[in-house]
UniProtKB/Swiss-Prot annotation:
Positions carrying Phosphothreonine: T282
Bias kind Gly residues: ranges: 79-90, 154-168, 232-243
Any Gene Ontology biological process: cAMP catabolic process
Protein name (database record): cAMP and cAMP-inhibited cGMP 3',5'-cyclic phosphodiesterase 10A
Any GO CC annotation of this UniProt entry: glutamatergic synapse
Residues reported in the UniProt entry to bind 3',5'-cyclic AMP: R562, C563, I606, A607, T640, Q659, H791, Q992
Keywords on record: Allosteric enzyme, cAMP, cAMP-binding, cGMP, cGMP-binding, Cytoplasm, Disease variant, Hydrolase, Metal-binding, Nucleotide-binding, Phosphoprotein, Repeat
InterPro entries: GAF (IPR003018), GAF-like_dom_sf (IPR029016), HD/PDEase_dom (IPR003607), PDEase (IPR023088), PDEase_catalytic_dom (IPR002073), PDEase_catalytic_dom_sf (IPR036971), PDEase_CS (IPR023174)
Gene name tied to this protein: PDE10A
Active-site residues, as the UniProt record annotates them: H791
Cited function: Plays a role in signal transduction by regulating the intracellular concentration of cyclic nucleotides. Can hydrolyze both cAMP and cGMP, but has higher affinity for cAMP and is more efficient with cAMP as substrate. May play a critical role in regulating cAMP and cGMP levels in the striatum, a region of the brain that contributes to the control of movement and cognition.
Record: residues binding 3',5'-cyclic GMP: H791, Q992
Catalytic reactions on record: a nucleoside 3',5'-cyclic phosphate + H2O = a nucleoside 5'-phosphate + H(+); 3',5'-cyclic AMP + H2O = AMP + H(+); 3',5'-cyclic GMP + H2O = GMP + H(+)
């Protein structure tokens, strides 16, 4: 027995070399590799010293670094066991050390090699050593593959690398046995031994014979990978035709045969107690660490071994079982998608160029057709086409036009008609009709296209790739036609995929550009609307400024040369305008000239038709349209090419027409221009409507001012009237009668203003108001009472007298402000009464009902009172402080509102409850307000407390006003209530009886309870009630006899 013992060598520094880069590396010869350290680094090498490499070879630098793999195919820790640098094709030379690892590369692309590692422990010590200066080679018979088979030693060993063998060449395992050899023991791991029997030494040592082959030529990684395994390439796989010298193969064939038999037995019979042939092989020469997973991995890398074995040794029944088991798996498992074509650097460059073009056009706002042409040029380069043609849809979308880019002298691109969209003509027409991509290898031999491409150079074209250009919403906008000339390779599926992907991306990108442009336009439009709004509110009356602003932006919105705006006169059925675009600019803005207004019939011209129909007209060629009036161009010398005419609609009616003339950039106004203009026209309609409405308001305001001036003249008293009142003195005989509740002011009409002045002075003092202002105020109030049957000036003075009588009999209960406010409130409580009830005004939507939803007339009375107080020389409360002024106005307001009979019922009920429970407190302001409200109702109804003849005459006046309202309701087809129906005048006594019992008697009863001095009002009301009962019974007396208390007071007053 021979033994081998060698020391561990230090690890060299520097990166690993590539396959074939170092000298002396090739088939049949060990390639120097970096040594492994004791922890797993370093390498194993063949006999002789190996140089330290300063860097990797070209192929190694070209390929990305890959981590070492574990025995299960997973990456191992850097520098750990299993680190591999073996490369080559077919079988490879492997440097063997203890422990050893075998690695095999699969037939997969060179960009992603896979290796399999064996990592056995060291064998037990053998009885003998090999000579220290020798190394043995283990030829292992493995089928030739494109990937390399390598074995590497780790821990105490290194990795191995070798070129591929050719044909059926065996892959020898080389075990260096001398410390002078590169690839000796690793550093830091002590000394290790490898023991082999003499029989094995005799079997293995003959493999050292024969010279080593020269190294393969240096090639780039990709080229080397393609040439590996090809005929004539040194180190090729099976049948490669390499020049590798053959070695003695007796031992190799014997071992390979034994391995195949044992391995086949395991595959056929399944797992057994005996190890597989491959495991036995490793147990004999390497270690017992081989597993079933490693065998499976090896077979996946070398499927031809399994193919040979299955075809020779496995029965058909067993194969059928395998197929059934395979088919039972889920059909949803899909193979990984091939994405390599989308990782091509050529396509990445195309995408970068497309991005660049899109960004440029997005910034400059270039035309989409020119942009598509430039993108098509990039796709031409990507597909290596000899040329291309770009088609766009013609008018009505039923024909194609070939796009010709602008030349040096030409300023604009051109669209040349190429023919209709139909099958049986050209390739482009066929694709436009079907909207499907078409690849034609020989266009001249295809009977579907008798006209071929339709291009002038069509005779030289052989292969054609034609693709539709479709927008994101599915609309066809063009056709891209790529072609190659005769003698060139035809387009293939990969070219179609590249062109389709890039064109689809370009379509989406252009759509995004259009969206961005739309957003930019929308932002610009929003800014304009804000600007117009600012202009409108800053100078709302200047409608000409607004129209000019609208026309300026309308031109910029659609990029038009001229603009005109006509307003519609529906009354005369005419269009008119006095603001015109003269084509000049000042400080970068168009100049509009205001001239004499021109008018023309709505039946003439394009603008007239738009005004009549309300439809948008987009005319690409004005002279081809019979509706266009050429006389305008002849008169002005201006040439009209195209027109976009838009109606301005407000409330379903056309109020104006905006006409854009001549698109500056482009052949005609586009659909996008129409859509933007429609949105703009909506705001124009709003702005014009508001401007016209404000104009009408201003006109109405002027009329209102003139009317108010007239009214003020007739509603304000003259100086003679108020000066005469200042000189008035009440007769002495009336001074006593005024103090009575039943005093009738009827016979003293000329004295009514003087009577009120007297009552104010008696109740509030002579210095409470300035006499001049008081006289002005009273006489103006008199003028503002209308001549209606009941709610007139007489009624106002009568109510004021009743309040004066109550205040005089309860003088200490009320403050000076309250007395002033209540007397003025009674005088003004029916100011400007129209003779109609609140229900009538609300039912027929009177303007007063729109102003005041509740207590309509009462709120109007208070408003009129304040208006008179605000007149010059009429503010009788001017001497009061600010707080007192507010208090007295609030007293007047509450008092006047309380005269609404609808509020009376709730107010009286609350007061009755408070009186019965003893909770009424006149020091409480809310209670006080309720009492004042009840006093105002009692004064308003005081006609029922007068002497019977006065009461009866007043009732006639009341019913005259009611019947007048009923007559108006009948005119409108509405049946009035009986109280207002003139035809039911016989029911008046019954109505009065109900009114007394429901309203008057309860009112005066509660008032008497709260203010006992007002009892004469209750007694007089009851006397009149008895008179109405007599009328109903037909017992009315010719002469009215009052109750003793009232008669006595009347006699006393006469004395």
């Amino acid at each position: 027995m021979a033994s081998l013992e060698e020391p561990l060598a230090p690890r060299p520094q520097g990166p690993l070399p590539a396959a074939g880069d170092e000298p002396g590396c090739g088939p049949g010869k060990l390639r120097p590799e970096p040594r492994l350290s004791a922890a797993g680094g370093g390498s194993a090498a063949g006999p002789g010293p190996a140089p330290e490499w300063p860097g990797r070879g070209r192929a190694e630098r070209a390929a990305p670094p890959r981590p070492p793999l574990s025995s299960a195919g997973r990456p191992s820790p850097a520098g750990g066991p299993g680190a591999l640098s073996a490369r080559g094709g077919g079988c490879g030379w492997v440097a063997a050390r203890a422990p050893l690892a075998l690695a095999f590369s699969s037939r997969v692309p060179s960009s992603s090699p896979s290796f399999f590692y064996f990592w056995p422990p060291p064998p037990p010590p053998p009885p003998s050593f090999l000579p220290s200066s020798s190394a043995f080679h283990l030829p292992v018979r493995l089928p030739g593959r494109e990937g390399a088979a390598a074995a590497a030693a780790a821990g105490g060993g290194g990795d191995a690398g070798g070129g591929g063998g050719g044909g059926q060449e065996a892959a020898p395992l080389s075990v260096p046995t001398s410390s002078s050899h590169r690839g000796g023991g690793g550093s830091g791991g002590g000394r290790r031994r490898l023991f082999l029997s003499p029989a094995l030494q005799g079997l293995l040592l003959p493999a050292r014979a024969g010279p080593r082959p020269p190294p393969p030529p240096r090639l780039p990684l990709g080229q080397a990978a393609r040439r590996a395994g090809s005929p004539g390439f040194p180190g090729a796989g099976p049948g490669g035709g390499g020049q590798t010298p053959r070695r003695p193969q007796g031992a190799s064939f014997a071992l390979a045969a034994a391995a195949a038999l044992l391995f086949g037995s395991d595959m056929e019979d399944g797992p057994s107690n005996n190890a597989s042939c491959f495991r036995r092989l490793t147990e004999c020469f390497l270690s017992p660490s081989l597993t079933d997973e490693k065998v499976k991995a090896y077979l996946s890398l070398h499927p031809q071994v399994l193919d040979e074995f299955v075809s020779e040794s496995v029965s058909a029944e067993t194969v059928e079982k395998w197929l059934k088991r395979k088919n039972n798996k889920s059909e949803d498992e899909s193979a990984p998608k091939e994405v390599s074509r989308y990782q091509d650097t050529n396509m990445q460059g195309v995408v970068y160029e497309l991005n660049s073009y899109i960004e440029q056009r997005l910034d400059t706002g270039g035309d989409n057709q020119l942009l598509l042409y430039e993108l098509s040029s990039i796709i031409k380069i990507a597909t290596k086409a000899d040329g291309f043609a770009l088609y766009f849809l013609g008018e009505c979308n039923n024909s194609l036009c070939i796009f010709t880019p602008p030349g040096i002298k030409e300023g604009k691109p051109r669209l040349i008609p190429a023919g209709p969209i139909t099958q049986g003509t050209t390739v482009s027409a066929y694709v436009a009709k079907s909207r499907k991509t078409l690849l034609v290898e020989d266009i001249l031999g295809d009977e579907r296209f008798p006209r071929g491409t339709g291009l002038e150079s069509g005779t030289r074209i052989q292969s054609v790739l034609c693709l539709p250009i479709v927008t994101a919403i599915g609309d066809l906008i063009g056709i891209l036609e790529l072609y190659r000339h005769w003698g060139k390779e035809a387009f293939c599926l990969s070219h179609q995929e590249v062109a389709t992907a890039n064109l689809a991306w370009a379509s989406v990108a252009i759509h995004q550009v259009q969206v961005c442009r739309g957003l930019a336009k929308q932002t610009e439009l929003n800014d304009f609307l804000l600007d117009v709004s600012k202009t409108y509110f800053d100078n709302i009356v200047a409608i000409d400024s607004l129209l000019e602003h609208i026309m300026i932006y309308a031109k910029n919105l659609v990029n038009a040369d001229r603009c005109a705006l006509f307003q519609v006169d529906h009354k005369n059925k005419e269009l008119y305008s006095d603001l015109f675009d003269i084509g000049e600019e000042k400080e970068g803005k168009p100049v509009f000239k205001k001239t004499k207004e021109i008018r023309f019939s709505i039946e003439k011209g394009i603008a007239g038709q738009v005004a009549r129909t309300g439809e948008v007209l987009n005319i690409p060629d004005a002279y081809a349209d019979p509706r266009f009036n050429r006389e305008v161009d002849l008169y002005t010398g201006y040439t009209t090419r195209n027109i976009l005419c838009m109606p301005i609609v407000s409330r379903g009616s056309v109020i104006g027409v905006v006409q854009m003339v001549n698109k500056i950039s482009g052949s005609a106004f586009s659909k996008t221009d129409e859509n933007n203009f429609k949105m703009f026209a909506v705001f124009c309609a709003l702005a014009l409507h508001c401007a016209n409405m404000y104009h009408r308001i201003r006109h109405s305001e002027c009329i209102y001012r003139v009317t108010m001036e007239k009214l003020s003249y007739h509603s304000i008293c003259t100086s003679e009237e108020w000066q005469g009142l200042m000189q008035f003195t009440l007769p002495v005989r009336l001074c006593k009668e005024i103090e009575l509740f039943h005093f009738d002011i009827g016979p003293f009409e000329n004295m009514w203003p003087g009577i009120f002045v007297y009552m104010v002075h008696r109740s509030c003092g002579t210095s409470c108001f300035e006499l001049e202002k008081l006289c002005r105020f009273i006489m103006s109030v008199k003028k503002n009472y209308r001549r209606v049957p009941y709610h007139n000036w007489k009624h106002a003075v009568t109510v004021a007298h009743c309040m004066y009588a109550i205040l005089q009999n309860n003088h200490t209960l009320f403050t000076d402000l309250e007395r002033k406010g209540l007397l003025i409130a009674c005088l003004c409580h029916d100011l400007d009464h129209r003779g109609f009830s609140n229900s009538y005004l609300q039912k027929f939507d009177h303007p007063l009902a729109a102003l005041y939803s509740t207590s309509t007339m009462e709120q109007h009375h208070f408003s009129q009172t304040v208006s008179i107080l605000q007149l010059e020389g009429h503010n009788i409360f001017s001497t009061l402080s600010s707080s007192e002024y507010e208090q007295v106005l609030e007293i007047i307001r509450k008092a006047i509102i309380a005269t609404d009979l609808a509020l009376y019922f709730g107010n009286r009920k609350q007061l009755e409850e408070m009186y019965q429970t003893g909770s009424l407190n006149l020091n409480n302001q809310s209670h006080r307000d309720r009492v004042i409200g009840l006093m105002m109702t009692a004064c308003d109804l005081c006609s029922v407390t007068k002497l019977w003849p006065v009461t009866k005459l007043t009732a006639n006046d009341i019913y005259a006003e009611f019947w007048a309202e009923g007559d108006e309701m009948k005119k409108l087809g509405i049946q009035p209530i009986p109280m207002m129906d003139r035809d039911k005048k016989d029911e008046v006594p019954q109505g009065q009886l109900g009114f007394y019992n429901a309203v008057a008697i309860p009112c005066y009863t509660t008032l008497t309870q709260i203010l006992p001095p007002t009892e004469p009002l209750l007694k007089a009301c009851r006397d009149n009630l008895s008179q109405w009962e007599k009328v109903i019974r037909g017992e009315e007396t010719a002469t009215w006899i009052s109750s003793p208390s009232v008669a006595q007071k009347a006699a006393a007053s006469e004395d």
